[in-house]
């Protein structure tokens, strides 16, 4: 993976897109099907040709690019607090996951079965969502650190919503892997926001 601000911005857009959908789903119960399908496809795309190919092209991460632009312009906005927390949580979990080759092996094998399910049922089918959520529960959820999702209890207690949230968090961690491969570090978020903003704005003009 080529290290560049462009690829870092694409990966961050993937993370923020998933994080924003988690926030919206947890608080309103509303799921954007196209955003969710992009997340699922990123999990089963094992041989992408580029950073944007992970998500199916720049158009697929346009919502994430817009959210990322808003955050980079005003990262202290209370409205972005949960989104930032989920993004940072995905970064933490990705780093821990990268150290566990045994867990990565299990995830890889089980995602192959998800890929076969997607071919038969599509990305949003209950069987697919449940399977992805189970992988997350059986592997990443076992780590001591967990992402605490806040929202409306009536939505969070619904099994389908909980499974969708786990699937989206899983995809955010996948995007965090891409972010690391592109050269992303947490220092960038603190000291290089102007460079990331410029790259994000250029990508939005093309998406």
From Swiss-Prot:
List cellular component terms (GO): cytoplasm; plasma membrane
- Main localization category: cytoplasm
Q: Name one Pfam family in it.
A: DUF489
Localized where?
A: Cytoplasm; Cell inner membrane
Stated membrane topology is: Peripheral membrane protein
Record bears the keyword Membrane: yes
Question: Which InterPro entries does this UniProt record tie to the protein?
Answer: HflD (IPR007451), HflD-like_sf (IPR035932)
Q: Does the keyword Cell inner membrane apply?
A: yes
Recite the UniProt keywords alphabetically: Cell inner membrane, Cell membrane, Cytoplasm, Membrane
Among HAMAP family, the record links this protein to: HflD_protein
As for family, the record states:
Belongs to the HflD family.
Q: What is this protein called?
A: High frequency lysogenization protein HflD homolog
| Organism encoding this protein | Teredinibacter turnerae (strain ATCC 39867 / T7901)
The organism's taxonomic lineage, starting at the top: Bacteria, Pseudomonadati, Pseudomonadota, Gammaproteobacteria, Cellvibrionales
As recorded in Swiss-Prot or TrEMBL, the protein's gene is named hflD
């Amino acid at each position: 993976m080529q290290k560049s601000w462009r690829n870092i911005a694409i990966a961050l857009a993937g993370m923020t897109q998933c994080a924003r959908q988690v926030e919206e789903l947890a608080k309103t119960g509303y799921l954007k099907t196209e955003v969710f399908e992009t997340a699922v496809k990123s999990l089963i795309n094992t041989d992408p040709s580029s950073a944007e190919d992970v998500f199916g092209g720049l158009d697929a991460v346009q919502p994430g690019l817009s959210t990322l632009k808003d955050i980079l312009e005003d990262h202290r906005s209370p409205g972005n607090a949960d989104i930032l927390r989920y993004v940072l949580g995905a970064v933490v979990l990705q780093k821990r996951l990268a150290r566990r080759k045994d867990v990565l092996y299990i995830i890889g094998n089980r995602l192959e079965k998800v890929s076969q399910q997607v071919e038969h049922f599509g990305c949003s089918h209950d069987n697919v969502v449940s399977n992805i959520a189970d992988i997350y529960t059986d592997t990443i959820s076992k780590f001591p650190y967990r992402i605490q999702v806040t929202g409306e209890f009536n939505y969070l207690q619904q099994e389908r919503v909980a499974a969708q949230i786990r699937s989206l968090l899983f995809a955010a961690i996948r995007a965090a892997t891409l972010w690391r491969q592109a050269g992303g570090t947490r220092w960038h978020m603190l000291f290089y926001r102007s460079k990331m903003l410029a790259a994000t704005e250029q990508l939005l003009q093309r998406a």
